């Protein structure tokens, strides 16, 4: 299944959520209505749907331009291009990341293997991901946080989509353990906001730590703290970026937990 198909499936799910939320908005009593923000966001949302293909063309042009200016025989270049393809064209991402796994420099080979495992887990190839995970030891210390994150994702996907209950429980425990290890590892670092590329993917440990802190606060029902963390990040990142969408969606989940229907709809639209 290609990334494009997966994207369409996720879009259908999002549209269903939005349609339900909008229908509820339409029948709410008038005293609950915000002045104009929901209507404005709905108009923006319609415009963004119409211009979706322009973003695809923009990304394609950016990748093609970058490929023409760097040495594509170098593992680091292959990793860079492979990561850019991940949310856009799955087959190309697999191709370039697989090439980079043959790098003679151990850290580059294992870095690309970790990205490849993450991608394989995302598209349902769990067995291949687990097989590759057995090739990672010994692991360069610089990749420890990425290793924890990747294995948490791999076990998490296997838990959600697995069929055997005993194995699902095993993967759930493993995912939780790796997430805890990642949380501890990130907290031990002196992390600060750094430049976030419009096309960046999973490269900013400060953002990952903030996301984990937000989720932890939400799980503890400390919604004020969760919203504060989200606001801190959203003030730093630009709209119309992948990072903004992620944290806007996390904010959506907070307001859903709080049963704040208007704020839920507002942030659902912003995240989309």
What are these regions (language model features)?
Residues 12-23:
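Bacterial N-terminal signal peptides
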Residues 2-13:
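Bacterial N-terminal signal peptides that target proteins for export
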């Amino acid at each position: 299944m290609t990334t494009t198909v997966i994207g369409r499936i996720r879009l259908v799910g999002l549209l269903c959520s939005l349609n339900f939320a909008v229908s509820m908005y339409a029948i709410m009593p008038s005293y609950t209505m915000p002045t104009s923000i929901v209507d404005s966001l709905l108009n923006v949302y319609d415009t963004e749907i119409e211009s979706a293909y322009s973003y695809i063309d923009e990304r394609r042009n950016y990748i093609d331009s970058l490929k023409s200016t760097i040495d594509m025989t170098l593992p680091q270049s292959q990793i860079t291009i492979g990561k850019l393809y991940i949310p856009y064209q799955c087959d190309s991402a697999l191709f370039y990341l697989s090439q980079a796994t043959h790098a003679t420099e151990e850290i580059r080979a294992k870095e690309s293997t970790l990205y490849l495992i993450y991608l394989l887990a995302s598209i349902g190839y769990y067995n291949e991901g687990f097989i590759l995970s057995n090739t990672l030891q010994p692991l360069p210390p610089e990749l420890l946080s990425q290793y924890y994150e990747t294995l948490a994702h791999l076990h998490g996907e296997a838990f959600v989509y697995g069929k055997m209950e005993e194995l699902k429980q095993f993967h759930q425990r493993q995912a939780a353990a790796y997430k805890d290890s990642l949380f501890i590892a990130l907290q031990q670092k002196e992390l600060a906001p750094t430049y976030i590329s419009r096309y960046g993917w999973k490269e900013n440990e400060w953002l990952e730590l903030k996301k984990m802190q937000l989720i932890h606060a939400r799980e503890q029902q400390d919604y004020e703290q969760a919203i504060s963390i989200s606001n801190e990040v959203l003030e730093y990142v630009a709209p119309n970026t992948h990072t903004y969408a992620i944290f806007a969606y996390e904010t959506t989940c907070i307001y859903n937990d709080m049963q704040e229907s208007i704020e839920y709809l507002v942030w659902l639209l912003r995240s989309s």
